[in-house]
Amino acid sequence: MSIKEKLSALGLTLPTAAAPVAAYVPAVKSGNLVFTAGQLPVIDGKLVKEGKVGSDVSAEDAKELAQICALNALAAISLVADLDQVERVVRVGGFVNCAPGFIAIPGVVNGASELLIKVFGDVNGKHARTAVGVAELPLNAPVEIEVIVQLKN
């Protein structure tokens, strides 16, 4: 089953890659690795929600936003590589725009991790990860996700 078919089976569609908001590209291929820029929870060019997780945005909503970010990361990867050529997800970096005292950061980033595991499988989808709480994110986004994947030789 292709990656697009797996996404469809999950009720998801690969979006068009979001345009960069500054001086960078959505993804870079270097050897057999693809690095994405940080992806925001954007649908059709618009930020789905903004604000701090734990005050303006619930942890549950933020987890769903992290899934949108991961889907956008797949779209970014598809600009430079065939998604069906992804061997495995290597690493996910998750950044959560936190209200003071909000510490459930790993649960938010799980939204991205769980989607990638569903799409690429339990072995190839599991990855190393960083989940960091931050004071601010671009455009006041609640979540930002970056992904590194390894391509098949």
Regions found by a protein language model. Give the residues of each.
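Short, polar/acidic, helix-capping and beta-turn segments at strand->helix junctions
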Residues: 1-153
